[in-house]
Amino acid sequence: MGEAYTTEFIKDNIENFKSFFTKLNKERFIVKELAPYIYELAPIKKTSVEKVIGLMALNHGNEVGGLFVLLEFLSLLDKGLVNLPGKITIGLGSVESAKLGKRFFEKDLNRCYGDVIGEGKDFQRAKVIMEAFKECHMSLDLHQTQTPSAQPFFPMTFNTKTFELIRAIDPQASIIPQKPYDQKGKGVPFSHYLVNRGCTAVTVELGTMGLDYKQIYYGVQLILKLLNYNLGKEPEEFRGSFFPKRGPVFPPGPDAWLRSDLGNFSEIKKGEVIGDYDGGKKWMAQESGFLAFPKAIRGLKRTQANENEPIYILLDRDPDYLKNRE
Protein backbone atom coordinates (compact mmCIF):
# COMPACT_ATOMS: atom_id res chain seq x y z
CA MET A 1 0.00 0.00 0.00
CA GLY A 2 1.13 3.58 -0.57
CA GLU A 3 1.60 6.51 1.78
CA ALA A 4 -1.43 7.84 3.68
CA TYR A 5 -2.99 11.08 2.48
CA THR A 6 -5.99 13.30 3.20
CA THR A 7 -8.68 14.63 0.89
CA GLU A 8 -7.31 18.13 1.54
CA PHE A 9 -3.93 16.97 0.25
CA ILE A 10 -5.58 15.65 -2.92
CA LYS A 11 -7.56 18.87 -3.37
CA ASP A 12 -4.35 20.90 -3.08
CA ASN A 13 -2.57 18.78 -5.66
CA ILE A 14 -5.49 18.90 -8.08
CA GLU A 15 -5.20 22.68 -7.90
CA ASN A 16 -1.42 22.36 -8.31
CA PHE A 17 -2.13 20.49 -11.55
CA LYS A 18 -4.32 23.36 -12.73
CA SER A 19 -1.82 26.05 -11.73
CA PHE A 20 1.01 24.32 -13.61
CA PHE A 21 -0.55 25.40 -16.88
CA THR A 22 -0.50 29.07 -15.89
CA LYS A 23 3.13 28.82 -14.77
CA LEU A 24 4.61 26.84 -17.67
CA ASN A 25 7.20 28.73 -19.70
CA LYS A 26 5.23 30.56 -22.40
CA GLU A 27 8.41 30.91 -24.46
CA ARG A 28 8.56 27.11 -24.81
CA PHE A 29 4.93 25.99 -24.74
CA ILE A 30 1.54 26.92 -26.14
CA VAL A 31 -1.14 26.16 -23.54
CA LYS A 32 -4.84 25.89 -24.32
CA GLU A 33 -7.56 25.01 -21.80
CA LEU A 34 -9.95 22.60 -23.53
CA ALA A 35 -12.23 22.08 -20.51
CA PRO A 36 -11.93 22.29 -16.72
CA TYR A 37 -8.77 20.36 -15.74
CA ILE A 38 -8.05 19.33 -19.35
CA TYR A 39 -5.36 21.11 -21.36
CA GLU A 40 -3.69 21.03 -24.72
CA LEU A 41 0.05 21.55 -24.59
CA ALA A 42 2.28 22.08 -27.63
CA PRO A 43 5.87 23.20 -28.18
CA ILE A 44 6.36 26.74 -29.51
CA LYS A 45 8.80 25.48 -32.12
CA LYS A 46 7.03 23.51 -34.84
CA THR A 47 8.03 19.87 -35.17
CA SER A 48 7.44 17.20 -37.77
CA VAL A 49 5.48 15.11 -35.24
CA GLU A 50 1.78 15.28 -36.08
CA LYS A 51 0.35 12.57 -33.83
CA VAL A 52 -1.36 13.87 -30.68
CA ILE A 53 -0.78 12.05 -27.39
CA GLY A 54 -3.47 11.86 -24.70
CA LEU A 55 -2.64 11.47 -21.00
CA MET A 56 -5.43 10.85 -18.50
CA ALA A 57 -5.66 10.30 -14.73
CA LEU A 58 -8.45 10.14 -12.13
CA ASN A 59 -10.97 8.36 -14.33
CA HIS A 60 -11.73 6.92 -10.90
CA GLY A 61 -11.60 9.60 -8.22
CA ASN A 62 -9.99 7.43 -5.55
CA GLU A 63 -7.15 6.19 -7.79
CA VAL A 64 -4.88 9.14 -7.07
CA GLY A 65 -1.56 7.69 -8.25
CA GLY A 66 -2.03 8.89 -11.82
CA LEU A 67 -2.48 12.50 -10.63
CA PHE A 68 0.99 12.46 -9.11
CA VAL A 69 2.47 10.83 -12.22
CA LEU A 70 1.14 13.74 -14.29
CA LEU A 71 2.37 16.31 -11.73
CA GLU A 72 5.87 14.84 -11.83
CA PHE A 73 5.85 14.79 -15.63
CA LEU A 74 4.74 18.44 -15.72
CA SER A 75 7.51 19.31 -13.29
CA LEU A 76 10.09 17.76 -15.63
CA LEU A 77 8.65 19.77 -18.53
CA ASP A 78 8.68 22.97 -16.51
CA LYS A 79 12.33 22.48 -15.52
CA GLY A 80 13.34 21.87 -19.13
CA LEU A 81 14.44 18.30 -18.39
CA VAL A 82 12.04 16.85 -20.98
CA ASN A 83 11.41 18.02 -24.53
CA LEU A 84 7.91 17.85 -25.92
CA PRO A 85 8.02 16.34 -29.44
CA GLY A 86 4.49 17.36 -30.35
CA LYS A 87 1.04 18.21 -29.09
CA ILE A 88 -0.41 16.44 -26.04
CA THR A 89 -3.82 16.52 -24.39
CA ILE A 90 -3.49 16.04 -20.65
CA GLY A 91 -6.37 15.88 -18.22
CA LEU A 92 -8.05 14.68 -15.06
CA GLY A 93 -11.30 12.73 -15.12
CA SER A 94 -13.49 12.50 -12.04
CA VAL A 95 -12.10 15.62 -10.36
CA GLU A 96 -15.01 16.51 -8.10
CA SER A 97 -15.34 12.99 -6.71
CA ALA A 98 -11.56 12.88 -6.14
CA LYS A 99 -11.84 16.02 -4.02
CA LEU A 100 -14.36 14.17 -1.84
CA GLY A 101 -12.32 10.98 -1.67
CA LYS A 102 -14.97 9.15 -3.71
CA ARG A 103 -14.59 6.84 -6.69
CA PHE A 104 -17.45 8.53 -8.59
CA PHE A 105 -20.84 10.17 -7.97
CA GLU A 106 -23.87 8.20 -9.20
CA LYS A 107 -22.19 6.26 -11.99
CA ASP A 108 -18.70 4.92 -12.68
CA LEU A 109 -17.17 7.56 -15.00
CA ASN A 110 -15.11 4.86 -16.67
CA ARG A 111 -18.34 3.23 -17.85
CA CYS A 112 -19.89 6.45 -19.19
CA TYR A 113 -17.97 6.77 -22.47
CA GLY A 114 -19.35 5.99 -25.91
CA ASP A 115 -22.85 6.26 -27.33
CA VAL A 116 -24.62 5.64 -24.02
CA ILE A 117 -27.21 8.23 -23.00
CA GLY A 118 -27.36 9.18 -19.34
CA GLU A 119 -27.82 12.02 -16.91
CA GLY A 120 -25.86 13.25 -13.91
CA LYS A 121 -22.39 14.63 -13.25
CA ASP A 122 -20.53 11.52 -14.39
CA PHE A 123 -22.19 11.41 -17.82
CA GLN A 124 -21.73 15.18 -18.23
CA ARG A 125 -18.04 14.87 -17.42
CA ALA A 126 -17.64 11.96 -19.86
CA LYS A 127 -19.07 14.07 -22.70
CA VAL A 128 -16.60 16.86 -21.94
CA ILE A 129 -13.67 14.43 -21.85
CA MET A 130 -14.65 12.71 -25.12
CA GLU A 131 -14.77 16.07 -26.88
CA ALA A 132 -11.40 17.15 -25.44
CA PHE A 133 -9.58 13.94 -26.42
CA LYS A 134 -11.15 13.53 -29.88
CA GLU A 135 -7.94 14.44 -31.77
CA CYS A 136 -5.68 11.97 -29.94
CA HIS A 137 -3.82 9.36 -31.96
CA MET A 138 -2.30 7.61 -28.92
CA SER A 139 -3.43 7.61 -25.31
CA LEU A 140 -2.33 6.39 -21.88
CA ASP A 141 -4.92 6.15 -19.09
CA LEU A 142 -3.42 5.84 -15.59
CA HIS A 143 -5.27 3.68 -13.06
CA GLN A 144 -4.72 1.83 -9.78
CA THR A 145 -6.34 -1.31 -8.37
CA GLN A 146 -8.69 -1.35 -5.38
CA THR A 147 -7.10 -4.55 -4.05
CA PRO A 148 -3.38 -5.42 -3.71
CA SER A 149 -1.36 -5.93 -6.89
CA ALA A 150 1.95 -7.75 -7.08
CA GLN A 151 2.94 -5.77 -10.19
CA PRO A 152 1.68 -3.18 -12.67
CA PHE A 153 -0.27 -4.56 -15.60
CA PHE A 154 -2.15 -3.62 -18.76
CA PRO A 155 -5.75 -4.76 -19.34
CA MET A 156 -5.96 -4.20 -23.08
CA THR A 157 -8.23 -4.53 -26.09
CA PHE A 158 -5.86 -6.63 -28.17
CA ASN A 159 -4.87 -5.44 -31.59
CA THR A 160 -1.50 -4.96 -33.26
CA LYS A 161 -1.32 -1.23 -32.56
CA THR A 162 -2.13 -1.44 -28.86
CA PHE A 163 0.36 -4.26 -28.41
CA GLU A 164 3.08 -2.30 -30.20
CA LEU A 165 2.40 0.69 -27.95
CA ILE A 166 2.65 -1.40 -24.78
CA ARG A 167 5.81 -3.06 -26.11
CA ALA A 168 7.29 0.40 -26.69
CA ILE A 169 6.60 1.74 -23.21
CA ASP A 170 7.20 -1.46 -21.20
CA PRO A 171 8.66 -4.44 -23.06
CA GLN A 172 8.40 -6.51 -19.85
CA ALA A 173 4.71 -5.76 -19.29
CA SER A 174 2.13 -8.12 -17.87
CA ILE A 175 -0.87 -7.98 -20.22
CA ILE A 176 -4.44 -9.16 -19.68
CA PRO A 177 -5.94 -9.27 -23.20
CA GLN A 178 -9.63 -8.40 -23.37
CA LYS A 179 -12.33 -8.65 -25.98
CA PRO A 180 -13.72 -5.39 -27.39
CA TYR A 181 -16.71 -4.02 -25.50
CA ASP A 182 -20.11 -4.00 -27.19
CA GLN A 183 -20.74 -0.26 -27.42
CA LYS A 184 -24.35 -0.35 -28.60
CA GLY A 185 -26.24 1.70 -26.05
CA LYS A 186 -23.74 0.87 -23.30
CA GLY A 187 -21.08 2.91 -21.56
CA VAL A 188 -17.52 1.61 -21.95
CA PRO A 189 -14.11 2.37 -20.41
CA PHE A 190 -12.16 5.35 -21.71
CA SER A 191 -9.47 3.37 -23.56
CA HIS A 192 -12.03 1.04 -25.19
CA TYR A 193 -13.96 4.08 -26.41
CA LEU A 194 -10.81 5.60 -27.93
CA VAL A 195 -9.77 2.32 -29.58
CA ASN A 196 -13.19 2.09 -31.22
CA ARG A 197 -12.57 5.59 -32.60
CA GLY A 198 -9.27 4.51 -34.16
CA CYS A 199 -6.97 5.78 -31.43
CA THR A 200 -4.17 3.54 -30.12
CA ALA A 201 -5.18 3.66 -26.47
CA VAL A 202 -4.01 1.65 -23.48
CA THR A 203 -4.78 1.56 -19.77
CA VAL A 204 -2.16 0.79 -17.15
CA GLU A 205 -2.90 -0.36 -13.63
CA LEU A 206 0.07 1.16 -11.80
CA GLY A 207 -0.46 -0.91 -8.65
CA THR A 208 -2.47 -0.76 -5.46
CA MET A 209 -4.41 2.43 -4.73
CA GLY A 210 -2.52 5.07 -2.77
CA LEU A 211 0.48 7.36 -3.01
CA ASP A 212 3.39 5.12 -3.99
CA TYR A 213 6.64 6.64 -5.22
CA LYS A 214 7.68 3.54 -7.17
CA GLN A 215 4.40 3.76 -9.08
CA ILE A 216 4.97 7.46 -9.78
CA TYR A 217 8.46 6.74 -11.14
CA TYR A 218 7.12 3.87 -13.26
CA GLY A 219 4.27 5.98 -14.63
CA VAL A 220 6.60 8.84 -15.60
CA GLN A 221 8.89 6.37 -17.37
CA LEU A 222 5.91 5.11 -19.39
CA ILE A 223 5.11 8.67 -20.50
CA LEU A 224 8.71 9.42 -21.46
CA LYS A 225 8.90 6.22 -23.51
CA LEU A 226 5.57 7.12 -25.12
CA LEU A 227 7.05 10.45 -26.22
CA ASN A 228 10.04 8.62 -27.72
CA TYR A 229 7.72 6.19 -29.48
CA ASN A 230 5.89 9.16 -30.98
CA LEU A 231 9.25 10.36 -32.29
CA GLY A 232 9.69 7.07 -34.14
CA LYS A 233 11.76 4.98 -31.73
CA GLU A 234 11.30 1.28 -32.48
CA PRO A 235 9.87 -0.90 -29.68
CA GLU A 236 12.15 -3.44 -28.03
CA GLU A 237 11.54 -7.18 -28.24
CA PHE A 238 8.65 -8.16 -25.98
CA ARG A 239 9.86 -10.01 -22.87
CA GLY A 240 6.69 -9.75 -20.82
CA SER A 241 3.80 -12.15 -20.25
CA PHE A 242 0.23 -12.57 -21.45
CA PHE A 243 -2.41 -13.62 -18.94
CA PRO A 244 -5.59 -14.44 -20.90
CA LYS A 245 -8.79 -14.82 -18.91
CA ARG A 246 -9.95 -18.37 -18.30
CA GLY A 247 -13.21 -17.29 -16.72
CA PRO A 248 -15.01 -15.76 -13.75
CA VAL A 249 -15.12 -17.53 -10.37
CA PHE A 250 -18.22 -17.18 -8.22
CA PRO A 251 -18.29 -17.46 -4.42
CA PRO A 252 -19.09 -20.97 -3.09
CA GLY A 253 -21.64 -19.57 -0.65
CA PRO A 254 -22.63 -16.51 1.39
CA ASP A 255 -20.15 -14.21 3.16
CA ALA A 256 -17.20 -15.43 1.07
CA TRP A 257 -13.75 -13.89 1.62
CA LEU A 258 -10.38 -14.57 0.04
CA ARG A 259 -7.28 -14.93 2.20
CA SER A 260 -5.69 -11.66 3.32
CA ASP A 261 -2.40 -12.40 1.50
CA LEU A 262 -4.01 -12.77 -1.95
CA GLY A 263 -4.35 -10.11 -4.63
CA ASN A 264 -3.93 -9.45 -8.34
CA PHE A 265 -1.56 -11.99 -9.96
CA SER A 266 -1.39 -14.22 -6.88
CA GLU A 267 -0.84 -17.79 -8.08
CA ILE A 268 -3.19 -20.40 -6.63
CA LYS A 269 -3.22 -24.20 -6.93
CA LYS A 270 -6.17 -26.54 -7.32
CA GLY A 271 -7.26 -27.77 -3.88
CA GLU A 272 -5.54 -24.91 -2.05
CA VAL A 273 -7.50 -23.16 0.71
CA ILE A 274 -7.96 -19.66 -0.70
CA GLY A 275 -10.46 -18.31 1.81
CA ASP A 276 -13.59 -19.02 3.80
CA TYR A 277 -17.36 -18.61 3.52
CA ASP A 278 -20.62 -19.11 5.40
CA GLY A 279 -19.24 -18.60 8.88
CA GLY A 280 -15.83 -20.24 8.51
CA LYS A 281 -16.17 -23.05 5.97
CA LYS A 282 -13.00 -23.63 3.96
CA TRP A 283 -13.02 -22.31 0.42
CA MET A 284 -10.95 -24.60 -1.83
CA ALA A 285 -9.70 -23.54 -5.27
CA GLN A 286 -11.33 -25.62 -8.01
CA GLU A 287 -8.62 -24.78 -10.57
CA SER A 288 -5.03 -23.56 -10.65
CA GLY A 289 -4.17 -20.19 -12.13
CA PHE A 290 -3.64 -16.53 -11.32
CA LEU A 291 -6.09 -14.14 -9.66
CA ALA A 292 -7.27 -10.89 -11.20
CA PHE A 293 -9.62 -8.20 -9.87
CA PRO A 294 -10.49 -9.95 -6.57
CA LYS A 295 -13.56 -8.36 -4.97
CA ALA A 296 -13.42 -9.55 -1.35
CA ILE A 297 -10.11 -9.94 0.49
CA ARG A 298 -10.16 -10.61 4.22
CA GLY A 299 -9.15 -7.48 6.13
CA LEU A 300 -10.07 -5.10 3.30
CA LYS A 301 -13.36 -3.46 2.42
CA ARG A 302 -15.43 -5.61 0.08
CA THR A 303 -15.56 -3.98 -3.36
CA GLN A 304 -18.85 -5.61 -4.29
CA ALA A 305 -21.90 -6.54 -2.25
CA ASN A 306 -23.68 -8.80 -4.73
CA GLU A 307 -22.84 -12.45 -4.04
CA ASN A 308 -24.21 -13.43 -7.46
CA GLU A 309 -21.27 -11.69 -9.17
CA PRO A 310 -17.80 -13.17 -9.77
CA ILE A 311 -15.48 -12.74 -6.80
CA TYR A 312 -12.37 -12.95 -8.98
CA ILE A 313 -11.25 -13.66 -12.54
CA LEU A 314 -9.01 -16.67 -13.13
CA LEU A 315 -6.08 -16.11 -15.51
CA ASP A 316 -3.64 -18.37 -17.32
CA ARG A 317 -0.07 -17.46 -18.15
CA ASP A 318 0.27 -18.23 -21.85
CA PRO A 319 3.81 -18.01 -23.29
CA ASP A 320 2.42 -18.89 -26.73
CA TYR A 321 -0.36 -16.30 -26.80
CA LEU A 322 1.06 -14.33 -29.72
CA LYS A 323 1.95 -17.47 -31.67
CA ASN A 324 -1.57 -18.86 -31.21
CA ARG A 325 -3.07 -15.66 -32.62
CA GLU A 326 -1.15 -15.95 -35.89
Residue spans for each PLM region:
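Structured catalytic-domain cores with a bias toward divalent-metal coordination
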Residues: M1-E326
